[in-house]
Amino acid sequence: MAIDQIRDAILSGDRSEETYANLPLPDTYRATTVHKDEVEMFKGLKSRDKDPRKSLHIDDVPIPELAPDEALVAVMASAINFNTVWTSIFEPVSTFGFLERYGRLNKYSKRHDLPYHIVGSDLSGVVLRTGGHVSKWKPGQEVVAHCLSVELEDADGHDDTMMDPQQRIWGFETNFGGLAELAIVKANQLMPKPEHLTWEESASPGLVNSTAYRQLISKNGAALKLGDRVLIWGASGGLGSYATQMALAAGATPICVVSSPEKAQICRDMGAELIIDRNAEGYKFWNDDNTEQNPKEWQRLGKKIRELTGGHDVDIVFEHPGRETFG
């Protein structure tokens, strides 16, 4: 089988362009999908009762035509993000709406509007083919991919790609994601795989590390610097743990908000000292029907922060959980 030949070539250590450019491609490949005709399967259930094992499928899918600015990658490892979980339980909306809208953009985006959605927003792997306009990447190169898919035809995105009106999260708002044997990405999503990391290690940071970097470090983000005090929500999770480590590496002081003693220990193990267990403190920032905030609870949180920092407010808030923690 062609997939077996691709796997064997990668495991052999041969990375010559000629070898990979001439490897036969399979007619189909295995991919993790959700199906458009099942978007109502969890209707009426609470979020915690929706089981992704019922909605996720392993399907044989065809390889679509490659666009001029894309690369076809043999996936060696991928990772799970919350957007994959959201996709699998069709919350807060079905991702097929994203695919339908993207499909109206141009000839090549039309490929994404399918009755199935291949999920996954991280990968490490080896380039197999490149589109006609790709010059940096060649077959045989080991790569990782970040999740931001952009068109960059609009000037709004030239200084900051997050401002591109056509920016999307690959594998969430686009099709052909990374939880598959093969994946299609835009060439500008690719980066060289770090030689000192395993396939699994290099596949896991793409989405969360780049997001945390954009928020905290980049010139378009908070421009974190020595001495800053940073309030980090969800500090033990994927995004939060990178934010915590970045703050420590920059000589800043992270104030880590977590939800359990176990998660607090994860932060301590990373080197953080100032930690707030929000469940132990009993914070309730919104009323029972989530229509109004409670200012006194935010004031109580502020008092706790100042107790930990010696009377200082924070310089940066690293917020990513969503509405409940928007003060």
Regions found by a protein language model. Name each.
Residues 62-79, 93-156:
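Glycine-rich beta-strand-centered segment in the early N-terminal region that forms part
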